[in-house]
Amino acid sequence: MINIVLFGKPGAGKGTQAEFLKEKYNLTHLSTGDIFRFNIKNETELGKLAKTFMDKGDLVPDAVTIKMLESEVDKNQHSKGFLFDGFPRTLAQAAALDTFLASKDQEVTATIALEADDEILVQRLLERGKTSGRVDDQDEEKIRNRYQEYNEKTAPLMSYYKNNKKFHAVNGIGTIQEITKRLSEVINNL
């Protein structure tokens, strides 16, 4: 079983690349953003709670995120592997994911970070916001707040996964096909 964590700042292309990777490697794609949106749309208790944080551009607390994610993994227990998109975002979440996967005799195989310049990403999100209807992609101040949160809370994950020899950085600038090729080269060499 292969379990890959795909991370990068909002707008780095995680969702786009995850679609290609899940097909190519037959993985179950677990996007925390999609899971949040589903729970918010359906007004679940966890969804209502998550929305209060997302509306401010803040990260959703670990306990809420972890409960949502564990539920999705349990629904897909016969999967050949998982592609975690947007999770973990903090060291506490990484430890919780390791503990949860260990309880199922699994582990994170690799983490791959899509890296790109903030200014390029801001423009990507503002363009996406024009057609996606996603409110959090239409406000530059909220976007920059999300990047600040990422730098403070998510960036330390690089050291955590580097220390475990599971971290790979991939250039997230280029065509979709170029980036997919770079990601595939990393995965094929695991």
Swiss-Prot record:
**Quaternary assembly:** Monomer.
Keywords in UniProt for this one? ATP-binding, Cytoplasm, Kinase, Nucleotide biosynthesis, Nucleotide-binding, Transferase
What this chain does, per the entry, is described as: Catalyzes the reversible transfer of the terminal phosphate group between ATP and AMP. Plays an important role in cellular energy homeostasis and in adenine nucleotide metabolism.
- Where do the record's region annotations for NMP lie? 31-60
- UniProt cross-references to Gene3D superfamilies, sorted A to Z: P-loop containing nucleotide triphosphate hydrolases (3.40.50.300)
Q: What is this protein called?
A: Adenylate kinase
Binding site residues for AMP: 32, 37, 58-60, 86-89, 93, 134, 146
Q: Where, by residue number, does ATP bind?
A: 11-16, 128, 174
> Biological process (GO) annotations?
AMP salvage
Q: Which family does it belong to?
A: Belongs to the adenylate kinase family.
Q: Which reaction does it catalyse?
A: AMP + ATP = 2 ADP
What GO CC terms are in its UniProt record?
A: cytoplasm
Location(s) in or outside the cell = Cytoplasm
The terms under GO molecular function for this entry are:
adenylate kinase activity; ATP binding
Q: Which domain of life is it from?
A: Bacteria
Tell me which EC number(s) this protein carries.
Answer: 2.7.4.3
What species does this protein belong to? Flavobacterium psychrophilum (strain ATCC 49511 / DSM 21280 / CIP 103535 / JIP02/86)
